[in-house]
A protein has these predicted regions:
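N-terminal [4Fe-4S]-dependent radical SAM core
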Residues: 110-163
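Canonical Radical SAM [4Fe-4S] cluster-binding loop centered on the CxxxCxxC motif
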Residues: 155-193
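Catalytic cores of alpha/beta
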Residues: 66-68, 252-254, 313-328
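Glycine-rich beta-alpha loop elements in corrinoid/cobalamin-binding modules
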Residues: 2-123
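Hydrophobic positions in alpha-helices of CheY-like receiver
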Residues: 43, 47, 230, 293-296, ...
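Short helix-capping segments at alpha-helix termini
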Residues: 44-50, 231-236, 330-334
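Conserved SAM/AdoMet-binding glycine-rich loop
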Residues: 196-303, 309-311
Length: 335
């Protein structure tokens, strides 16, 4: 197809300009798998001695029980969870095969084997350093949006530097969530000043002052500390991120977040039914969500809510009632 040919040509151009020894490909979603494998195949075709490693969100959730060795026709290694330690171990292993690997799948014969070394610990969130866009021509990226809703547009319209306020989830109780996954289970924070240092470094590198905090759910206390340090250090940014609609987000805190540059939040309402919210162990009620979303909206902050229908035991009447409560939230300008 035209898309295939375009992807192949772009890959060839990069491989000719920068002959690699090691290529890492992030596979965040199912829709990225085909492109990732196509790029990996091209790397192997042009530079047979280059090593290819896959990682990312899709790998972390869907390939934890990998048993089919055919994927290694395209790549050499697959790493799980946070990439810093596995990639560092892989680089050292390629220099010296006696060095151990960490959470890395390899093919041995016709079998998939996971190599790991528990003694080699992951880097703490405070020590992972600042993300970098070095070598990436950001001017080549265009803004796209599929609808006029200003909240929905944020995901693809504009330029957002990505950062994480805290690693993992501080709540870790929702029954529909896989709490065993490292990116949820291992909760770690960094100081507000460390976060502001990273923000300033990204602004200097990219020239962009828009930030998307991609936490599972940013902790209210950490957001308060971050907002206070942004204001105290006179760092002017525009930011948005994911939260839980919990009572800690008072009118006073929400107004502080707005002053620090917050323009939008996204959170999981899931179902507008207190019985089902209790079954989910969400730790919120419909009335509480209404109060919190109203506080954000009153401060001029856009609010997006995730919803799900057909949760186990949900009755027809509960579905109707939930739809009506969501309609009321829209009508009142809360979301």
């Amino acid at each position: 197809t035209l898309v295939d040919e375009t992807l192949d040509e772009l890959t060839r151009e990069k491989l000719r300009a920068f002959p690699p020894d090691l290529v890492g490909i992030t596979v965040p979603f199912p829709g990225n798998v085909y492109g990732a494998l196509r790029i990996a195949r091209m790397v192997k075709s042009i530079h047979p001695k280059a090593r290819v490693v896959l990682g990312g969100g899709y790998v972390n959730t869907e390939l934890r029980q990998l048993s089919d060795p055919r994927v290694f026709d395209f790549c050499d290694y697959i790493t799980l969870d946070d990439g810093e330690r596995p990639l560092l171990a892989l680089v050292e292993h390629l220099r010296d095969p006696n060095q151990p690997l960490v959470r890395t799948y390899v093919r041995e014969g016709n079998r998939v084997v996971q190599k790991t070394t528990p003694a080699l610990l992951d880097l703490h969130h405070r020590d992972t350093g600042t993300p970098t866009y070095a070598g990436l021509d950001l001017s080549q990226y265009v803004s796209l949006f599929e609808m006029l809703n200003p909240m929905h547009r944020l995901w693809s319209d504009g330029r957002w530097n990505k950062l994480t306020v805290a690693k993992g989830c501080y709540w870790k109780k929702c029954t529909f969530c896989d709490l065993s996954l490292d990116y949820i289970a291992r909760y770690e924070t960094a100081t507000a000043d460390v976060l502001v240092d990273r923000i300033e470094a990204l602004i200097k590198e990219t020239g962009q002052t828009g930030f998307h905090f991609v936490d599972e759910a940013a902790p209210p206390a950490a957001l308060r500390a971050l907002a206070e340090r942004l204001i105290a250090r006179r760092v002017a940014i525009t930011w948005w991120g994911n939260i839980r609609f919990e009572k800690s987000f008072t009118k006073e805190l929400v107004e502080l977040l707005a002053r620090s540059g917050c323009i939008a939040v996204s959170g999981g309402l899931e179902v507008a039914s207190d019985r089902l919210l209790a079954l989910m162990q969400k730790g919120v009620t419909v009335a509480q969500v209404a109060r919190v979303t109203r506080a954000f909206s009153a401060a001029g902050i856009l609010v997006h809510a995730y919803l799900m229908y057909g949760f186990p035991t949900q009755t027809e009447q509960e579905t109707i009632d939930s739809l009506e409560r969501v309609r009321q939230l829209f009508a009142e300008g809360c979301i």
